[in-house]
Amino acid sequence: MEDFVRQCFNPMIVELAEKAMKEYGEDLKIETNKFAAICTHLEVCFMYSDFHFINEQGESIIVELGDPNALLKHRFEIIEGRDRTMAWTVVNSICNTTGAEKPKFLPDLYDYKENRFIEIGVTRREVHIYYLEKANKIKSEKTHIHIFSFTGEEMATKADYTLDEESRARIKTRLFTIRQEMASRGLWDSFRQSERGEETIEERFEITGTMRKLADQSLPPNFSCLENFRAYVDGFEPNGYIEGKLSQMSKEVNARIEPFLKTTPRPLRLPDGPPCSQRSKFLLMDALKLSIEDPSHEGEGIPLYDAIKCMRTFFGWKEPNIVKPHEKGINPNYLLSWKQLLAELQDIENEGKIPKTKNMKKTSQLKWALGENMAPEKVDFDDCKDVSDLKQYDSDEPELRSLSSWIQNEFNKACELTDSIWIELDEIGEDVAPIEHIASMRRNYFTAEVSHCRATEYIMKGVYINTALLNASCAAMDDFQLIPMISKCRTKEGRRKTNLYGFIIKGRSHLRNDTDVVNFVSMEFSLTDPRLEPHKWEKYCVLEIGDMLLRSALGQVSRPMFLYVRTNGTSKIKMKWGMEMRRCLLQSLQQIESMIEAESSVKEKDMTKEFFENKSETWPIGESPKGVEEGSIGKVCRTLLAKSVFNSLYASPQLEGFSAESRKLLLIVQALRDNLEPGTFDLGGLYEAVEECLINDPWVLLNASWFNSFLTHALR
């Protein structure tokens, strides 16, 4: 039979059939009848489409080969014969441009004249039996069915045969010829008898031998063999069954499974209120660095030495003054804290010998800023259980905050490239196995795309600050230790660079439990005027501390330099995770790898090189009010990294809850897009669970806004 197929059919058809069988894990040397059936079906699909065009007036015309008008639009789009991913892409494209309903199963053709998908069937049995099987499988009135047999019979939906008599006769003649050729070689009987009913992929796999015995032994109770269980599963109606089971559980439970349709979901309700404020542990897009290139000073690498060297690069210091007070704080204390820091650094310089660490004097302003002696005294419960009015503190409900544009700007900035390199390629030994070679190639490509990214700077900054703060918290528990906020990078030319963002002063830190809090005051340099977005800086007291000369197109311009000061706190567990922010690189690399794997499995070869080097291709990045945003593979890498970094920087119970609950809603919407007819009960309860996490967190509110954009475009 295999030889006959290769002689009888066009080599292109044979090649497509081989690919299709390979895709479903079938061996054409064994399944020779299936090989012949696939080739026959492909040929009928191609013949159905041949010579049929649509002219400029939108009329269907037949044009024989060699005709000069052959540049007309093809009447039929051929879907059969393409690999699954490409075929679904074509189907989705047709649905988007024509408004046709998306079919559940891949059809064979699309008819641009009648605006409908067509399912072609070729049967060795009775046409009406095969027609009913097809209709039963597809369950869609929108897809047109047309069945041909090897005996010259045909059957089509509503007896609408689509094509003219002559075109259909050509197909019937070809099928009759194939039958005659098979019969003359003694192949027809086997081929005719081998046809099974319309089958799904799962049914094609025959289980025999040991696996069959294991299958029969592994059934749920009350099933004697695999066939009985399969029959039960095929006839299973999940929605009704779940309703029935729930009603048996309790009289109070009454869940009706409601169909989830395009019109069912509503947008998430974002809270009203004043705009949300910045709550990260350090400044992001607004940070300013004082930097030294090619550091080679004495004590290079010791934070305090590096910090003093960076401070010396700036000459524009001036008498500080408050430009944006903190509404609830004692603002002069913040001002005095900065003045104290400058004075104590000056003392170090005057002494000439710089110590490795610096503990600040415990002044009244620092004691206030670090909450010294502010914690209520702890009393043993046994000593006060007789107190009649003993009760827990009344805690206020958190104030609702609305989404503000600054958080989207922060995210956009995190995705951008800087002019510095923040991570090096790992120095890893020679690859031993091919898989290691592919892995290190992917890692190197990915690193090249993200090494200049601002999100990578945030990772290195976060790792440094959390490591330094945790070390100081353990090594100098009672001291108000000064911790410079430092990062290191390379310039594009490869020169080393040390950057100072500002300082942290740590409070008392007797951290016994993971969640015990250490207070700290952060003082960070910036060129951002806080009066432009005062709501963003609600938690900060901002000082003007100097003037910085900047090079611009107009020559040198002077800009005021600000110091953003605030009291903050963290815990051992938060610092531990902050120290491990490099994991964000790994997480986003794994997401990119899964995209490469999907592409590679379709193409049947490793696509890493093509994936990163094909600069013309664009990929979906995310949803915005405009629709699906697309960008280069580098932009995708940086966006995924920025999302992972922001999940770390803005980690909170609100984010945990929103991620877990919105994921359920997302899966239901995905099921709807995949035509899986999802059903839900208590959808209102799910919305409630999602929306109770939308309180005041800027990152959660932004994600909720993205989710609404996704809903809008996914359900068009």
Curated annotation (Swiss-Prot):
Belongs to the influenza viruses PA family. Mn(2+) 2 binds at E80, D108. The keyword Phosphoprotein applies. Its cofactor is Mn(2+). GO terms for molecular function: endonuclease activity; metal ion binding; RNA binding. Pfam families: Flu_PA. It comes from Influenza A virus (strain A/USA:Iowa/1943 H1N1). A motif (Nuclear localization signal 1 (NLS1)) lies at residues 124-139. GO terms for cellular component: host cell cytoplasm; host cell nucleus. This is Polymerase acidic protein. Its main location: host cell.
